[in-house]
Design a protein with these regions (language model features):
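Canonical Radical SAM [4Fe-4S] cluster-binding loop centered on the CxxxCxxC motif
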Residues: 52-87, 180
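C-terminal scaffold of the Radical SAM
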Residues: 46, 76-99, 106-401, 455, ...
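A short, conserved structural fragment
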Residues: 415-425
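Short, cationic-aromatic polyanion-contact patches
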Residues: 182, 306, 427-444
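Short, amphipathic alpha-helical interaction segments positioned at domain boundaries
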Residues: 434-460
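Short amphipathic alpha-helical interaction segments
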Residues: 400-413
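Flexible, acidic/Gly-rich N-terminal and inter-domain linker regions that tether
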Residues: 1-54, 103
Length: 460
């Protein structure tokens, strides 16, 4: 079966390396400061000429409480008044960007991320969605994939009703862990009842899909405690579930310095949590999509993987990878054709630049032919666990074995170790290699070296 996983502890220990999650290739680590607003506007014109469908990502950076594990770009504040000045600059960015696209380009996908998007008041959410509808071709028939990240502590039934009214049909809930001791250790107190209430509201209001995020490897977690959390989440029957590995990088993310290393689970316990979780989810009928994602068989991700159309971008696994992605807001990333661009990550600088009527594009890169080739290889492996050489050769005008000749001994070693099946026609990731597909993809990453690896989490 496509979703089958074989647990091999020895292989996992050998290939559990630090490396990218490949929501893009090249990864954001390679972005440079030579990319600016002109590059973005030129790419938008090309998108308009090609009439490509669009995906919008809006970043709302505010959180009322700090979660010690968090590595997101965020602003911690209880001052709700800080949202309005940011919203005004976000609206200005929307206005500028909209001049360079065709109003007939449909917005097939929309995602509000953060931070905590529901930090915005109901009136502010209404205002923002109205502004988007004025300047972009948002779909009115509920056929779009319109999602928002929700902190169950910051939402209630009225919030959910408003979101459904505004056109959102998918929600993603941050849960991470339901054990009170773990929650205290990461400063995120959230009851099962709060989470259940939001899931029930989503079902009653006919949201199309509910996703729940969990993290293993947090302080005070044990295999037994985390198994209880997974069981409680399974009982809520989310359509999708993300199971992230906590990466403790306190030298990069200041909030993580409040976590004591002594409270973190051992590598053996982390492996046990992952193994137990996979077994629990599999028994409950969830399919392994890849990396850290699971979905019910009738979910669009599972169907797309079955049909060979699943893709991956900055929003994770997606059925809309064919869309040009426009990122709006502080630190937001766009992927338009062969251009990656990112807005300023400092909120004060972002707001000042937009206040002057200019886009806040600060960095990015243009993909070359080699980038496009390697991106296609990584995309195929990470989404479908297989690669047909002929498809890549036809699309990119090369001979796979010759182009990647230097990698062949390493690929043969992966074959001997049981991670892949390397044949004359392609690569098939075996069940024992699916949890380690990132390690396979790293072979094709020409930018990766030991110094770069230190900036990423481990595979498991």
């Amino acid at each position: 079966m496509l979703d089958a996983i074989q647990w091999d502890a020895d292989l996992i220990r050998r290939y559990d390396l630090a490396g990218p999650r490949y929501t893009s290739y090249p990864t954001a680590v390679q972005f440079h400061d030579d990319i600016g607003p002109f590059d973005l506007l030129h790419a938008l014109r090309d998108s308009r000429k090609a009439r490509r469908p669009l995906s919008l990502y809006l970043h709302v950076p505010f959180c009322a409480h700090i979660c010690y594990y968090c590595a997101c770009n965020k602003v911690i504040t209880k001052d709700r008044g800080r949202a309005l000045p940011y919203l005004e600059k976000l609206e200005r960015e929307i206005e500028i960007i909209s001049r360079y696209i065709d109003r007939n380009q449909p917005i097939e996908q929309l995602h509000f991320g953060g931070g905590t998007p529901t930090f915005l008041s109901h009136d502010e959410l209404r205002r923002l969605m109205q502004h988007l509808r004025q300047h972009f071709n948002l779909l009115d028939d509920d056929s779009g994939d319109y999602s928002i990240e929700i902190d169950p502590r910051e939402a209630d039934w009225s919030t959910m009703g408003l979101l459904r009214e505004l056109g959102f049909n998918r929600v993603s809930l941050g849960v991470q862990d339901l054990d009170p001791e773990v929650q205290r250790a990461v400063n995120r107190l959230q009851t099962l009842e709060e989470t259940r209430a939001i899931v029930e509201a989503a079902r009653t209001l006919q949201f199309r899909s509910v996703n729940i995020d969990l993290i293993y490897g947090l302080p005070k977690q044990t295999p037994e405690r985390f198994a209880r959390t997974v069981a409680e989440v399974i009982a809520l029957q989310p359509d999708r579930l993300s199971l992230f590995n906590y990466a403790h990088l306190p030298e990069r993310f200041m909030p993580q310095r409040r976590i004591s290393v002594d409270d973190l689970p051992s590598p053996a316990d982390k492996l046990a949590m992952l193994q137990n979780s996979i077994e629990q989810l599999t028994r409950a009928g969830y399919r392994y999509i890849g990396m850290d994602h699971f979905a019910l068989p009738d979910d669009e991700l599972a169907i797309a993987q079955e049909e060979g159309t699943l893709q991956r971008n900055f929003q994770g696994y997606t059925t809309h990878g064919h869309c040009d992605l426009i990122g709006l807001g502080v630190s937001a990333i766009s992927q338009i054709g062969d251009l990656y661009s990112q807005n300023d990550s400092d909120i004060a600088s972002y707001q000042q630049t937009l206040g002057n009527g200019q886009l806040a594009t600060r960095r990015g890169l243009h993909c070359n032919a080699d980038d496009r080739l390697r991106r296609a290889v990584i995309q195929q492996l990470i989404c479908h666990f297989e690669l047909r050489f002929a498809d890549i050769e036809q699309a990119h005008g090369m001979v796979f074995r010759d182009y990647f000749a230097a990698l062949w001994p390493q690929l043969q070693q992966l074959d001997r170790d049981g991670l892949i099946e390397l044949g004359a026609e392609g690569i098939q990731v075996r069940p024992a290699g699916r949890l380690l597909v990132r390690s396979l993809c790293m072979l094709f990453d020409r930018y990766l070296n030991d110094q770069v690896r230190q900036r990423f989490s481990r595979v498991i």
